[in-house]
């Protein structure tokens, strides 16, 4: 255990020291080394988390938007929403700590009803999840009878339960077309729905939810980036406005962005998404210049080493889903995973 801790600590220090591109979005990790006392606390948190994972037979699932000290330092499984949902099914542990936002923890619980699922901060929410309620879904069914409802995973379990099938930004087009119908409702992300609609012949009716991180990007941002950084490759998340996606060189989920950088190896690239995405993959691509142009998600940043440690120590913030909601919500998620 000590050797594993030391290796991860060394790796993390290398990230901080050798990759200046991380500095703009590594405020917490930078602060860790601002004083001797902070460094000691940082080291103690890392070591304690590894020991607690061992004692409790726990695993940490971390989203790509988590800070590098979590993503590279303590996480056992990392990925985008789709990857975490798929991998959660096969987790061999008694306890799952979801280093992400609440809807992700609910999804992990839906797929692992017998396991203890913890979220380090119960207030880690999501603007998309908060943009729609089960009552809204019921009204949509009345307004558009017989039309399937495809629900983005960035929603509460209660909204999933009122839906027909889920999707992620990585499989939305595939899910929509797999239904074999001419028209669907896609909720709650308006921009994701509009971007998918451009790629398929299926007619898509959208809701009015937006991601507070991705809605801030604009096509003028891309023009400025290209002017300031000639030859830059622009990757955009499909939660961005359609004119941003149209102006980008590539649009895809965070997993697709990572794969693009790995396979294409652009000389310089900018990721129009949450800041930690670039931070976390830059370490694996020292020959790629990552241009900083990102927005922080305040909800993702509520997760810290300290509250991960507390969650494991005190079994704090256990996630539960009412049985009447869990069964239909699980079906909607499982239908997606089966495609």
UniProtKB/Swiss-Prot annotation:
Alphabetically ordered keywords of this record: 4Fe-4S, Cytoplasm, Iron, Iron-sulfur, Metal-binding, Pyridine nucleotide biosynthesis, Transferase
Gene Ontology CC terms: cytosol
Enzyme class: transferase
GO biological process: 'de novo' NAD biosynthetic process from L-aspartate
SUPFAM superfamilies associated with the record: NadA-like (SSF142754)
Example GO molecular function: metal ion binding
Cellular compartments annotated: Cytoplasm
Residues reported to bind iminosuccinate: 63, 81, 152-154, 169, 237-239, 254
Cofactor binding annotation: Binds 1 [4Fe-4S] cluster per subunit.
Pathway where this protein functions: Cofactor biosynthesis; NAD(+) biosynthesis; quinolinate from iminoaspartate: step 1/1
Residue positions binding [4Fe-4S] cluster: 126, 211, 297
Catalyses which reaction(s): iminosuccinate + dihydroxyacetone phosphate = quinolinate + phosphate + 2 H2O + H(+)
Domain of life, source organism: Bacteria
Enzyme Commission numbers on file: 2.5.1.72
Cofactor requirement: [4Fe-4S] cluster
PANTHER family documented for this protein: QUINOLINATE SYNTHASE, CHLOROPLASTIC, QUINOLINATE SYNTHETASE A
Biological role stated in the UniProt entry: Catalyzes the condensation of iminoaspartate with dihydroxyacetone phosphate to form quinolinate.
Family, per entry: Belongs to the quinolinate synthase family. Type 2 subfamily.
This protein's name: Quinolinate synthase
Source organism of this protein record: Xylella fastidiosa (strain 9a5c)
